[in-house]
């Protein structure tokens, strides 16, 4: 909890800014016991007097009064400015320019209150490239840079303007980073050490009643659109299939699910194979957050180490493949699980709920929340090495 700010300072994020006057002490005329004018023993350093008049003492008294009055005036204005109902200090609106909207040539409507909907005021998103010279930050999504569908306006870049590299893909599916040495100042990604950290989801405190757990009629499900035998998830599925009933959906299986069908379908399953397409640092996607937790199925996680998942969810909210020595051992554990043990995986639902963070507008609005705290002089000289680590 931040240290309370005393009346002699103004609170700013992460620091205290002193007002332009020294620390106040009690005036000398309050703290000093005055000597009488007709003292019979003035002492060797007594002030010269004329008929009981002490000029130096009188000046000191007036100086103390003036200092005290100055302090009271400044303190009054400080209290008046911070009183309830007083006019707030206006904050300038930040403009975040999205150079190319992710995965589309048609950006969504971006009204002025877009970021207000996500709890961030004084923040404006725009896809209008004519604002390049005045934007407070410019965001470049990597996929369009990778395919050269979008090019960097290096010759038009205003001096000192922060540029943001954005990507929610894994390093295995991110190429061409060597072309961007010494260009970007900040990174927006799912990595926890990113300048703008935007996970695919998170758990938040539950504000209403707990929703009932959907009835289960099937064992395990998996939605896969891009099946490649060389991937670890494909190999693990091949090893599990002889021991575990897995219903496979998605384009790769010829059984695609419509957007409105996805969660109701997966809710009927006890387990969901939340297998990431590649295993990288902090790479936990909608497969875990949406297809499993939000649908009401227990995630069977293949991705980063268990400790990474436990940074986001309780340790008893999921099954991790690393906890088992073989696919067969994992399958036996899932099939033989009794009802009491199974329901224990949902204990978190009594106090928490899933918040999905898949909207790019919300992700970009997060830049404004982080903006005051990010170093302007920072540059990623070797973005590829950082992201591939």
Curated annotation (Swiss-Prot):
Glycans are attached at residues 128, 338. It catalyses: an N-acetyl-alpha-neuraminyl-(2->3)-beta-D-galactosyl-(1->4)-N-acetyl-beta-D-glucosaminyl derivative + GDP-beta-L-fucose = an alpha-Neu5Ac-(2->3)-beta-D-Gal-(1->4)-[alpha-L-Fuc-(1->3)]-beta-D-GlcNAc derivative + GDP + H(+); an alpha-Neu5Ac-(2->3)-beta-D-Gal-(1->4)-beta-D-GlcNAc6S derivative + GDP-beta-L-fucose = an alpha-Neu5Ac-(2->3)-beta-D-Gal-(1->4)-[alpha-L-Fuc-(1->3)]-beta-D-GlcNAc6S derivative + GDP + H(+); a neolactoside IV(3)-alpha-NeuAc-nLc4Cer + GDP-beta-L-fucose = a neolactoside IV(3)-alpha-NeuNAc,III(3)-alpha-Fuc-nLc4Cer + GDP + H(+); a neolactoside VI(3)-alpha-NeuNAc-nLc6Cer + GDP-beta-L-fucose = a neolactoside VI(3)-alpha-NeuAc,V(3)-alphaFuc-nLc6Cer + GDP + H(+). Disulfide bonds join 115-123, 258-261, 365-368. GO terms for molecular function: 4-galactosyl-N-acetylglucosaminide 3-alpha-L-fucosyltransferase activity; alpha-(1->3)-fucosyltransferase activity; fucosyltransferase activity. Highly expressed in lung and bone marrow and to a much lesser extent in spleen, salivary gland and skeletal muscle. Residues 79-389 are lumenal. It is found in: Golgi apparatus, Golgi stack membrane. N-glycosylated. It is an enzyme of class 2 (transferase). GO terms for cellular component: Golgi cisterna membrane; trans-Golgi network. Keywords: Disulfide bond, Glycoprotein, Glycosyltransferase, Golgi apparatus, Membrane, Signal-anchor, Transferase, Transmembrane, Transmembrane helix. Residues 1-55 are cytoplasmic. Its main location: Golgi. The chain crosses the membrane at residues 56-78. One of its GO terms (biological process) is regulation of insulin receptor signaling pathway. Pathway: Protein modification; protein glycosylation. Inhibited by NaCl. Inhibited by GDP in a concentration dependent manner, with an IC(50) value of 93 uM. Also inhibited by GMP and GTP. Inhibited by N-ethylmaleimide. Activated by poly(ethylene glycol) by enhancing the thermal stability of FUT7. Activated by Mn2+, Ca2+, and Mg2+. Both panosialin A and B inhibit activity with IC(50) values of 4.8 and 5.3 ug/ml, respectively. Inhibited by gallic acid (GA) and (-)-epigallocatechin gallate (EGCG) in a time-dependent and irreversible manner with IC(50) values of 60 and 700 nM, respectively. Its EC number is 2.4.1.-. It comes from the Eukaryota. It is a single-pass type II membrane protein. InterPro entries: Glyco_tran_10_C, Glyco_tran_10_N, Glyco_trans_10, GT10-like_C_sf. Catalyzes the transfer of L-fucose, from a guanosine diphosphate-beta-L-fucose, to the N-acetyl glucosamine (GlcNAc) of a distal alpha2,3 sialylated lactosamine unit of a glycoprotein or a glycolipid-linked sialopolylactosamines chain through an alpha-1,3 glycosidic linkage and participates in the final fucosylation step in the biosynthesis of the sialyl Lewis X (sLe(x)), a carbohydrate involved in cell and matrix adhesion during leukocyte trafficking and fertilization. Belongs to the glycosyltransferase 10 family. This is Alpha-(1,3)-fucosyltransferase 7. It comes from Mus musculus (Mouse).
């Amino acid at each position: 909890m931040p240290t309370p700010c005393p009346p002699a300072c103004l609170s700013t994020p992460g620091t205290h800014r002193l007002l332009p006057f020294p620390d106040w002490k009690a005036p000398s005329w309050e703290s000093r016991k005055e000597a009488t004018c007709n003292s019979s023993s003035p002492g060797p350093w007594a002030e010269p007097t004329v008929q009981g008049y002490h000029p130096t003492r009188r000046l000191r008294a007036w100086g103390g009064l003036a200092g005290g009055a100055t302090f009271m005036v400044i303190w009054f204005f400080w209290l008046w400015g911070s009183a309830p109902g007083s006019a707030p200090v206006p904050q300038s609106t930040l403009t975040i320019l999205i150079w190319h909207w992710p995965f589309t040539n048609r950006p969504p409507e971006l009204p002025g209150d877009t970021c207000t909907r996500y709890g961030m005021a004084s923040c404006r998103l725009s896809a209008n490239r004519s604002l390049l010279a005045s934007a407070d930050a410019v965001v470049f999504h990597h996929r369009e840079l990778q395919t050269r569908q979008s090019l960097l306006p290096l010759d038009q870049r205003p001096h000192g303007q922060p540029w943001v590299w954005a990507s929610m893909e894994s390093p295995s599916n991110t190429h061409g980073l060597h072309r961007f040495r010494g260009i970007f100042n900040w990174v927006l990604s799912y990595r926890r050490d990113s300048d703008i950290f935007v996970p695919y989801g998170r758990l938040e405190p539950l504000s209403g009643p707990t929703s009932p757990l959907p009835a289960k009629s099937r064992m395990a499900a998996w939605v896969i659109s891009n099946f490649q035998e060389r991937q670890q998830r494909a190999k693990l599925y091949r090893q599990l299939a002889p021991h575990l009933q897995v219903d496979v959906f998605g384009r790769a299986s010829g059984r695609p699910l419509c957007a409105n069908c996805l969660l109701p379908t997966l809710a009927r399953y006890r387990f969901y194979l939340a297998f990431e397409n590649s295993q990288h640092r902090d790479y936990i996607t909608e497969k875990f957050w949406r297809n499993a937790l939000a649908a009401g199925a227990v995630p069977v996680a293949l991705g980063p180490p268990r400790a990474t998942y436990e940074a986001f969810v309780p340790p008893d909210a999921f099954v991790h493949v690393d906890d088992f020595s073989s696919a067969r051992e994992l399958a036996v554990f899932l099939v033989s699980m009794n009802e009491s043990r199974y329901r224990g995986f949902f204990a978190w639902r009594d106090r928490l709920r899933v918040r999905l963070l898949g909207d790019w507008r919300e992700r970009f609005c997060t830049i404004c929340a982080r903006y005051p705290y990010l170093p302007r002089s920072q540059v990623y000289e070797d973005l590829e090495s950082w992201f591939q680590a």
